[in-house]
A protein has these predicted regions:
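Rossmann-like NAD(P)(H) cofactor-binding subdomain of soluble oxidoreductases
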Residues: 64, 70, 75, 80, ...
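Glycine/serine-rich anion-binding loops at beta->alpha junctions
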Residues: 168-174, 219-229
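NAD(P)+-binding Rossmann beta1-loop-alpha1 motif at the extreme N-terminus of oxidoreductases
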Residues: 1-100, 157, 177-178, 241-242
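Small-residue helix-packing motif on alpha-helices
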Residues: 63, 73, 97, 113, ...
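Short pre-catalytic strand/loop immediately N-terminal to key active-site residues, enriched for Gly-Thr
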Residues: 10, 165, 215-220, 271-276
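NAD(P)-dependent Rossmann-like dehydrogenase/reductase catalytic/cofactor-binding core
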Residues: 2-9, 252-328
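Internal alpha-helical scaffold of NAD(P)-dependent oxidoreductase catalytic cores
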Residues: 84, 142-163, 177-217, 230-267, ...
Length: 328
């Protein structure tokens, strides 16, 4: 399925365009520039061609970024300056952004979702549109309850509602290395909608589709995961510094070692087999691994993901002090 001919591009609005919203917009707009360059290059009769990526029927061509503060607007203007012709930045005017949009990306803080969506004008402006939420801990049903007072599973195209989709990208979106989890929808999205949502998030990294019941664990693993990995990276770099390596080189070496390891795993190597391959009898690797096992690093890291999963489930409920005590 290719992009339709003519001036039929979609308008994408980001409500609450912070760090993640900027990263997603940047990835999408950079990709659109690449597509235009590829089209221009393919017009040349010389050289060889490679199979083109299958595109959604319609792609975004106009963009709105909605923020509350002037400082946020200035930041977007600087970071997305090369895309200025197709981007409109709105301060304190969410309603216009939603009215202009075909697709709305909801990127505000989870506790603000009620204030942003809970009025009749926004509800009317969203009618028949696609609303993609990247809010941690906020299920589709909660958003539908805010908008409509219930979470009916009727086909929105039959009752004038917007279609709500939940996705969980992570901070690596900034370097287009996100791991995004998209919740499957009931009833399923139409083929054009599904293609568009998947395309949007593959602009910033990898994508998997999982049931809604997996989203809190996905938030913990993928959303919180970069912080967990950064702590491990920092710890091994600290150990190297303690043994005499310069800080900058130790951090670079640790980061590249982690990157290389993930490359092997993404290439199909099982972590346990990889670990065993490096652990020669009587060597330094097995000695270090046993220290990690004695320190229950495996169980502690697993518990961190479990704890973050439980906390993630509370984020959209307005619960205060969710990290004040351990959930049982």
């Amino acid at each position: 399925m290719g992009q339709s001919n003519g001036d039929s591009g979609l308008t994408l609005t980001v409500l609450g365009c912070g760090t993640m919203g900027i990263a997603i917009l940047s990835g999408i707009m950079d990709s659109l520039s690449d597509i235009r360059s590829s089209v221009s290059a393919s017009a040349s009769p010389s050289g060889t061609s490679t199979p083109a990526e299958e595109l959604p029927q319609r792609l975004p061509s106009r963009f709105f970024a909605c923020v509350r503060r002037h400082e946020s607007a200035k930041r977007i203007k600087v970071e997305l300056s090369k895309h200025a012709p197709s981007l409109t930045i709105l301060e304190g005017d969410n309603l216009r952004g939603v009215r202009e949009a075909d697709v709305v990306l909801l990127g505000c803080k989870p506790q603000m979702v009620g204030d942003i969506l809970g009025n009749d004008d926004i509800r009317e402006a969203l009618k028949g549109k696609l609303l993609v939420s990247i809010l941690a801990g906020v299920p589709v049903e909660q958003i539908e309850n805010i908008l409509y007072g219930d979470s009916s599973f009727e086909d929105p195209s039959q009752n004038g509602r917007c279609r709500v989709v939940r996705a969980m990208p992570n901070t690596a979106s900034k370097v287009r290395e996100s791991m995004t989890v998209i919740a499957t929808s009931t009833p399923p999205l139409s083929a054009p909608q599904s293609s568009l949502v998947t395309w949007m998030f593959t602009r910033i990294g990898r994508v998997v589709h999982l049931p809604p019941s997996a989203m809190d664990a996905s938030t913990a693993l993928c959303g919180s995961g970069p912080a967990f990995m950064a702590l491990i990276l920092e710890a091994v770099a600290d150990g190297a510094v303690a043994m005499g390596l310069p800080r900058a080189e130790a951090q670079l070496m640790a980061a590249q070692t982690m990157r290389g390891t993930t490359g092997l795993v993404l290439g199909g190597e099982h972590p346990a087999i990889l670990r065993d391959k490096v652990s020669t009898p009587g060597g330094c690797t097995i000695g270090g691994l046993l220290v990690l096992e004695e320190g229950t690093v495996r169980g502690t890291m697993a518990r961190a993901v479990r704890e973050a999963t439980v906390v993630a489930s509370q984020l959209g409920k307005g619960v205060q002090g969710v990290n004040g005590t351990r959930f049982r």
